[in-house]
């Protein structure tokens, strides 16, 4: 049996970080996930998914992501129930996240944090350095598929089809 969920969406509110009596961090959050089709008016509707994440990833989510941040969630569906304040049973279906990926830098979220520009520049420089390293590596390796103008000698028996 398989219970696996992968979602990409935007936080609908700031994550709600709390701690259990034992000191374990838990964050509740909601994400809006666009549906892959449009309605009759041509608008794309969204589903609003309740999620929960535990321990250090919960603290990271609460510290670095805010309402509107784009995140990727990997986890599983869980249903649970509890007795509400009015004595009625309340049923909850939520995604228990194993991991949350931050899909935007702080600087791309509209300047919510004054250090966002520094972080974005640092990431950009790191990306440029990685690209320069990769291009230098590519120059050192010769293309095995480069055509030197010579016919390719291969028998029909060597072809997989």
Swiss-Prot record:
Keyword check for Repressor: no
GO terms, biological process: DNA recombination; DNA repair; DNA replication
Gene3D superfamilies listed in its UniProt record: Nucleic acid-binding proteins (2.40.50.140)
Molecular functions per Gene Ontology: single-stranded DNA binding
Lineage: Bacteria, Bacillati, Bacillota, Bacilli, Bacillales
UniProtKB keywords: DNA damage, DNA recombination, DNA repair, DNA replication, DNA-binding
SSB domain residues: 1-104
Chain positions covered by the region annotation Disordered: 106-161
Protein name: Single-stranded DNA-binding protein
Any one Gene Ontology cellular component term annotated for this protein: nucleoid
Signal peptide: none
